[in-house]
């Protein structure tokens, strides 16, 4: 239903900013030094906007086709939630339920239009987490898995900076190390460090490029964003209470299961 109605949904403020920047990539060629209404727009990494612009380039420049990459990422997120659950020794039946819950969660669907950067940051991070388990299960450094994890970590960084590292990746590492026995802790640590180093290189080049090409504007925006995170972006703990009900209809059986 979401896929069929993507073209008629109202555009949110954050989504409009993404679409304007994507449109200016196509019309003005501002792929690296991103802009919004002709003004520098460096507050957000460009990967989700690139994907929206590429989709519009190959199909049509409208809201529907610029939303398609986010819709595809929802499907990928559900698929990898299923695969991750199954890899963690959970039955196929329960893993399918996990994937279905992801696909039908109100919050997952909502952030495609409410926060288009988030769905990509967390989607790519979930892929990185899935492949990182292959690192944990090898007693020696496996470069193939290290590279795959590093690439998807960098995609997450190019979608919304380090947010998903703090929200998903590092908590997952802590939980996994506590619960599961590792064949070789030293090898695992080195593999993760190599993946993080690769992610830093692949995910940080755009920031360095913009800083080099437009230093004054980049530093001014960075200073303003830093100030925002210490002022109006600070929320009281009860601000996040609504997250418990953002699974939509699945909040009801989840609540009943706790009784």
Regions found by a protein language model. Name each.
Residues 1-15, 197-209:
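Transmembrane signal-anchor helices characteristic of membrane glycosylation enzymes that use polyprenol
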Residues 68-89, 127:
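Transmembrane-helix motifs of polytopic, lipid-linked glycan transferases
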Residues 6-23, 30-33, 39-51, 61-64, ...:
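Extracytoplasmic catalytic/substrate-binding loops of multi-pass membrane glycan-assembly enzymes
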Residues 110, 145-160:
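Membrane-interface alpha helices of multi-pass inner-membrane proteins
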């Amino acid at each position: 239903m979401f896929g069929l109605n993507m073209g008629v949904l109202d555009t949110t403020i954050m989504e409009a900013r993404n679409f304007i920047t994507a449109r200016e990539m196509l019309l003005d060629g501002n792929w690296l030094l991103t802009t919004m209404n002709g003004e520098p727009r460096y507050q957000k990494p460009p990967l989700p906007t690139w994907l929206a612009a590429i989709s519009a380039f190959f199909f049509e420049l409208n809201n529907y086709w610029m939303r398609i990459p986010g819709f595809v990422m929802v499907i990928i997120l559900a698929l990898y939630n299923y695969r991750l659950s199954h890899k963690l020794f959970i039955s196929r039946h329960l893993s399918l339920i996990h994937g279905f819950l992801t696909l039908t969660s109100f919050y997952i669907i909502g952030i495609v239009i409410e926060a288009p950067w988030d769905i990509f940051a967390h989607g790519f991070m979930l892929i990185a987490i899935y492949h990182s388990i292959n690192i944990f299960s090898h007693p020696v450094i496996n470069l193939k898995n290290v590279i795959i994890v590093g690439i998807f970590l960098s995609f997450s960084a190019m979608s919304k900076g380090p947010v998903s590292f703090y929200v998903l990746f590092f908590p997952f590492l802590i939980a996994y190390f506590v619960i599961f026995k590792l064949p070789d802790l030293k090898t695992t640590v080195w593999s993760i460090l190599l993946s993080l180093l690769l992610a830093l290189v692949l995910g940080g080049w755009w920031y360095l490029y913009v800083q080099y090409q437009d230093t004054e504007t980049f530093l001014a925006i960075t200073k303003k964003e830093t100030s925002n995170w210490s002022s109006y972006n600070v929320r009281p703990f009860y601000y996040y209470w609504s997250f418990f009900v953002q699974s939509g209809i699945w909040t009801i059986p989840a609540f009943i299961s706790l009784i």
